[in-house]
Amino acid sequence: MTAILITGYRSFEIGIFDHKDPRVSIIKQAIRKDLIGYLENGVDWFIFTGNLGFEQWALEVANELKEEYPLQIATIFLFETHGDKWNEKNQEVLSQFKAVDFVKYYFPNYEQPTQFSQYYQFLLEKTEGAYVFYDTENETNLKYFLKKAKDMPHYQLLLLTFDRLNDMSQS
């Protein structure tokens, strides 16, 4: 079994507030290409954390690819309360993250800041690599996860960057 964690920018972090934004289709093209590459190299599990934005778009692509490839999808939420306060539209997305092959809640609820690092350590230990939409030019809290991932020997990291997206949009 080979599992890849999929995470990246949330939609608000890159200024995408509408699913019909033309940038979403370019991002999804890149996701499709990269996920197919993973599947053709033996990956059989895609792991999500349940965030809006990149993960949401990658989940949509992964669900489409299930028709062609034998893959499994899991969502491992940080807290059981994840998304409880989202609006109705986003609740629909949350239900998609819960309608996968495996769902787990790492903690019942928030108690202390160390839960975040424990959660990311768990994800790193349970996956062989990560596919991350991230660019050092636009830093977010993902930088802490990426630092941990880069420090792990043999952990495979594939970054989808703004430069790669620009190249794809021009071709």
Curated annotation (Swiss-Prot):
Entries under InterPro entries matching the protein: YspA
UniProt superkingdom: Bacteria
HAMAP family in the record: UPF0398
UniProt similarity note: Belongs to the UPF0398 family.
Name of the protein in question: UPF0398 protein SpyM50438
Organism per entry: Streptococcus pyogenes serotype M5 (strain Manfredo)
Highest classification ranks of the organism: Bacteria, Bacillati, Bacillota, Bacilli, Lactobacillales
